[in-house]
Amino acid sequence: MKESTMAQTQARFDRVRWEPGVYAIVGATGIGKSAEASKLALSHSAPIVVADRIQCYSDLLVTSGRAFDAKVEGLNRVWLDNRTIHQGNFDPDEAFDRLIKVLTSYVDRGEAVVMEGGSISLILRFAQTISNLPFPAVVNVMPIPDRQHYFAQQCARARQMLRGDSTGRNLLTELAEAWVLGDQHNFIASVAGLDCVLDWCATHSVTPEELANRDLTTEVLDELAASMGGRYVEHGVLQQEIFLRTFGAPGVTAR
C-alpha cells in the first residue's frame, strides 16, 4: 500500500478523540488494512479484533492471509473463532453476534479497540446496527489505490500464497488437505482464490492434491497468480463499492 495513503488514514484517526469505543478500519482485500490496524493499535496500546470469517479457519492460514500478518511484539490480534474446514461455513449472523460480544467486552472494561476487516457480511451488519451498538464507533474506509497498481499488487499477493510461508505450507497444500475431506466442497469453492485454483484443476484434469505435489513451472505459477489476482481485484472492487455506498467517501464516519 502507498505510504501516503497509510499516513492519511493515520491522520484521520488522529483528528478523532481517543476514548473507550471501537475504531474500525474497513476496506477492500489486500490493501494494507492489517498493517494500518497494527500501526494504530500499537500507537494506542489497543487490541485488534479481526472482522473476518475466513481468517477464523486454522487450516486456511495462508489462503486467508492470516499467516502473513506481521507478528508484532506487544500486539494483541483477536479472531472471532478457531475453526476448521470440517465445521463448514461460519454463519454470518453467528459471526456478527460474536464480533459484537468481543468488541463490547473490551469497551465495557473501559478500553478502546481497533476493528479491522473487509467481510461484506459483517461490515454491512455493523453498519446497519451502528446507531444501536452498545458502544461508540468510528469507521475509516480505506480506498483502493489505482486499479493497475492494485491488480499487480494482488498478483504478487497470490504468488506469495502459492509459494507459502516459512513452514512450507501454501495455498495449494491447504486446498489439497481440505478437498480430501469431501464434505465441504461447496464451501471451499466459495473462497476467493481457491475457486480459481479449482477451475484450473478442472480445466487441466488434475486433482488439487496432484497440483499441490507438483513443482510449479513459471508458466503455471504465472497463470494461477494472474487468475487469483484478477479474482481478488473483482472482489475488492465489490467491497469498495459496497463500503462507500454504506459509509460515504473514504474517511472517518463517527457514531
Curated annotation (Swiss-Prot):
Keyword Transferase belongs to the record: yes
Q: SUPFAM superfamilies attached here?
A: P-loop containing nucleoside triphosphate hydrolases (SSF52540)
Which reaction(s) does the protein catalyse, per the Swiss-Prot or TrEMBL entry? dimethylallyl diphosphate + AMP = N(6)-(dimethylallyl)adenosine 5'-phosphate + diphosphate
**Domain of life, per lineage:** Bacteria
Stimuli inducing this protein: During the interaction with host plants.
**EC number(s) on file:** 2.5.1.27
GO terms in the biological process aspect are: cytokinin biosynthetic process
Transmembrane ranges, per UniProt, are none
Q: Does the keyword Transferase apply?
A: yes
Q: Name one GO molecular function term.
A: AMP dimethylallyltransferase activity
Keywords on record: Cytokinin biosynthesis, Plasmid, Transferase
Q: What does this protein do?
A: Transfers dimethylallyl groups to AMP as part of the biosynthesis of cytokinin phytohormones.
Tell me the protein family, please. Belongs to the isopentenyl transferase family.
Under which name does UniProt file this protein?
Answer: Adenylate dimethylallyltransferase
